[in-house]
A protein has these predicted regions:
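Tandem amphipathic alpha-helical repeat scaffolds
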Residues: 218-227, 253-266, 287-305, 325-343, ...
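Extended alpha-helical scaffolding segments used for macromolecular assembly and cargo binding
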Residues: 179-265, 270-274
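C-terminal boundary/linker of central alpha/beta nucleotide-binding cores
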Residues: 8-9, 14-17, 53-55, 97-175, ...
């Protein structure tokens, strides 16, 4: 025999014993709740055609409660506009209110009804908050009793937290508004103060706005606004200020926080409006400091960061003793220091910021700081440190569900750079893609240009044929943008040599020359400018002039922005010296390059060198001293042609754009006159291009040219 009991509350007798004995099957309200599809089917039985968005909203409002859905169907049937009826379907709806009063409220003792009315504002009701709102010390017992007696009062996973069904809660709020509206507003205020202590910033802001008390919201933001920004709630702070129509022109501290919040979520238009409105005003010290931080942060999203640092005197600021404000300053200043190339200062500020953010429990700021530290150590050419910090950032983000957070984009970029400089192309490609996916709407200029450049570089390394030409073109275009003049010396020092390499690989000598001139204009007399000038001269066959320039790097007074530049210079010098017939001199310069690169695992310039370096290493085994193992690793990478298809090779001179186009026609069986007709040129012109292709590839015939071009990734 089976006994079925149906009721809105648990029977008090025998149920616990049956449950323990395993003789009881229970179907609770959540088991009987309709799914979205079932809700749609119910409406369909009433002949109602409701779109997916409205069905979803209705299901969210009713939480699948069958009676609520039935009432909604009856309401929609009588409505002129379905969308409006759904939007207005809450506990204040007449049909719903009548049902709840008749079926739920009327049979309750007066003290329980009063308790429900006194605690209806919060979406989730902590027992402590219930005590404070109701004034009843037995609030926990009351809530437990209500949850047992009524399916519309739910106990959460945390047994100390309850929730009223949204329909019941909106009914109670509407009823309280009719009886004593000030009580409901007071509830929102008390709830906001309670939630701030949890902390639950977004919900606290919502309740403060709902209280209608501007002074309360202002105090809440003034005391907690910086903390909200550190916790990733800047967007909610900004929305609350808008909803409440706070007069920012009369509230400088709130205005400064609103500007910082807008910058945090990439709302540059709002940030610019607020900053412009307060650009010539005098404020209290705290507001002034926040506005100055906002000005520097705005410049980091596009503008002259170095001038902003000078105008704000931020580099000389001492700590204030207010932890959240100090953290904001350290993170901003640490990131900004990278623009003028102050990597040591950046690392000091960011290390202090990481310690402070960790102690304060601001995980979002911890993630940002870890990412920035990976960039700062990378700028200092500490590649092991860079890998350490980027890995820490990625590992920190993963369990928190932040794998696509814009705060992680920089760490992904540096992880991709690690893969690039070590020759791990699959890793480079993966992290370059993740970095692009993580970019926000208006990211830091340095981060965005770095990420976009890395994506183009990854596409170049993993492509063959015309795909390489497209990737190189995209890389070139990125560095023509005005933002390229705003990035740090480190990013310029790492990226522009790749711009030159890619340009030369597709025959765009003019692009390479322009890139070298750009660096010379920004960093005149620097090692970076000299090496790029030498690269361009070497590409034009002017090896002697290139070597003359490279010798100047041995002078002590040549400024160096990234130490890797000198490694690249030694590798280039080794190639040119070898081409002049001096094997011993070439080997000596190569060992100079190994001296710095070996202990740091820096391989990229050697991987870019190609066949001449492979041959030099292979014929010099035993001559590298403590670098024998490193030399063997480089040789292995260079000779693994199957695994490195598409890497730079021994091509004597880069192909021009037209030669690249003609090369793509060579695998076909078409005659030269047919190819000439396609391009609108003479047969002799095509033959001239083909002869140049053969010479540059070091082959003597069409079939050999195709095979060699495929081997080196040009096809």
């Amino acid at each position: 025999m089976r006994i079925i009991l149906i009721g809105r509350s648990d029977p008090t007798s025998c149920i616990p014993r049956l449950r323990v004995a395993g003789l009881l099957s229970e179907l609770r309200a959540k088991d009987l709740a309709f799914s979205v599809a079932e809700s749609a089917a119910l409406l369909d039985t009433h002949g109602l055609r409701v779109d997916t968005a409205d069905i979803t909203q209705l299901h969210r409002r009713t939480e699948g409660w069958p009676a609520g859905l039935r009432l909604a169907a009856l309401t929609i049937e009588q409505a002129e506009d379905v969308h409006t009826a759904v939007a207005q379907f809450t506990g204040s709806n007449h049909a719903v209110a009548d049902y709840l009063f008749t079926e739920v409220i009327r049979g309750m003792p007066a003290d329980l009804v009063e308790f429900l009315l006194a605690t209806c504002a919060p979406e989730e009701l902590d027992i402590g908050l219930a005590r404070q709102l109701s004034g009843r010390q037995d609030a926990g017992q009351v809530l437990e009793r209500l949850s047992r007696a009524n399916a519309l009062v739910l106990q959460m996973a945390d047994p100390a937290v309850y929730r009223y069904h949204s329909i019941l809660r909106t009914y109670l709020a509407a009823e309280l508004t009719k009886r004593a509206p000030a009580r409901l507003l007071r509830q929102h205020m008390v709830t906001a103060d309670w939630l701030i202590g949890k902390p639950s910033y977004a919900a606290a802001l919502s309740h403060s706005v709902a209280s209608g008390d501007e002074n309360h919201l202002v105090r809440l933001i003034e005391r907690n606004g910086i903390r909200m920004i550190h916790s990733g709630k800047g967007g909610r702070l900004l929305a609350a200020a808008r909803e409440a129509k706070l007069p920012l022109d009369r509230l400088p501290l709130i205005a400064a926080m609103a500007a910082l919040a807008a910058l945090d979520v990439g709302d540059l238009a709002t940030a610019d409006t607020v900053l412009a409105a307060h650009s010539h005003s005098a404020f209290d010290p705290r507001s002034t400091m926040l506005f100055r931080i906002a000005h520097v942060q705005r410049r980091m999203l596009g503008g002259d960061v170095i001038s902003a640092l000078d105008r704000t005197s931020m580099l000389s600021w001492a700590r204030t003793g207010e932890p959240d404000l100090d953290l904001l300053m350290l993170v901003c200043r640490g990131s900004a220091r990278l623009r003028p190339g102050d990597t040591a200062g950046a690392i000091n500020d960011l290390t202090a910021a990481l310690e402070l953010a960790t102690s304060l429990g601001h995980d979002e700021t911890v993630l940002w700081t870890l990412s920035q530290l990976s960039g700062a150590t990378g700028s200092a050419c500490d590649f092991l440190g860079m890998q350490h910090w980027s890995n820490r950032a990625i590992e920190f983000a993963r369990p928190r569900g932040w794998a696509r957070s814009p705060r992680l984009a920089y760490a992904y970029l540096l992880a991709a750079w690690t893969g690039f400089q070590t020759g791990e192309i699959d890793s480079q490609s993966l992290y370059a893609q993740l970095a692009e996916e993580a970019l926000g709407r208006h990211p830091n200029v340095e981060v965005e240009l770095g990420v976009r450049s890395m994506a183009a570089l990854a596409a170049f390394e993993s492509s063959t044929g015309f795909g390489r030409y497209e990737a190189a073109t995209h890389f070139h275009d990125l560095w023509q943008a005005p933002a390229a003049r705003e990035v740090s010396p480190a990013l310029t020092g790492f990226a522009v040599p790749q711009e030159v390499r890619l340009a030369l690989s597709i025959g765009e000598l003019t692009w390479a020359r322009d890139a070298a001139a750009r660096v010379a204009g920004r960093f005149p007399g620097s090692a970076e400018a000299l090496v790029l000038a030498a690269e361009v001269l070497a590409a034009r066959g002017k090896n002697r002039e290139a070597l003359t320039i490279l010798r100047r790097l041995r002078q002590d007074d040549v400024p160096v922005h990234v130490r890797t530049t000198l490694v690249a210079a030694d590798v280039l010098a080794a190639r040119l010296i070898l081409a002049a017939g001096d094997r011993h001199g070439s080997l000596s310069r190569l060992i100079d390059a190994f001296d710095w690169a070996d202990q740091r695992g820096f391989r990229r310039p050697f991987l870019d060198a190609g066949a001449w370096l492979a041959e030099l290493i292979a014929t010099s085994t035993g001559e590298f001293g403590r670098h024998e193992r490193f030399a063997a690793q480089i040789l292995q990478s260079l000779t693994d042609s199957d695994d490195s298809a598409g890497r730079p090779t021994s091509i004597v001179s880069p192909l021009t754009r037209r030669e690249t186009e003609v090369l793509r026609d060579l695998p076909s069986q078409r005659y030269f006159d047919q190819i000439a007709q396609d391009y609108g040129v003479s047969v002799n012109t095509v033959k001239t291009h083909v002869a140049s292709i053969y010479r540059k590839l070091g082959v003597t015939g069409r079939r050999e040219a195709v095979l060699e071009a495929r081997r080196i990734g040009l096809l």
